[in-house]
Amino acid sequence: MKILLDTNIIVDILAQRSPFFEDSFKLLNTIYDQNHIPCVSASAVTDIVYILRKYIADKKKLLDTVKDFLKLVAILPTTQHTVSNAFLLNFDDYEDAVQLQVAMENKISRIITRNQKDFRSHIVATQTPKAFLQEQEA
């Protein structure tokens, strides 16, 4: 199963943001343990680097951290088709629309995010890290 990790989940892991780090880190380990494929949209990478500047001051350390993390996930393309069709979703938050469009184009089974309300579509299932972990433990 391919699982798209939303930007907030990746930042939680890389910045070790409390109180979200523990569930997000456990989520990533569970995804690997169950042979699922963790995915990140190419468009999210710039957002991740930008947000992490608040948490990791040293530029080299920041970039190395992100580069190392990206070796662990599949990076999904964000194309002209993706960004154009994301407008048609009519989301309040365009970044979330792009994430959903990437998910649809790549046959993603679910999106893991802390902001489920931002993904008001039922096209691709969304879950919080905690809900995903509870489901996997059941």
State where each predicted segment sits.
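Active-site-proximal, substrate-binding regions of enzyme catalytic domains
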Residues: 25, 47-74
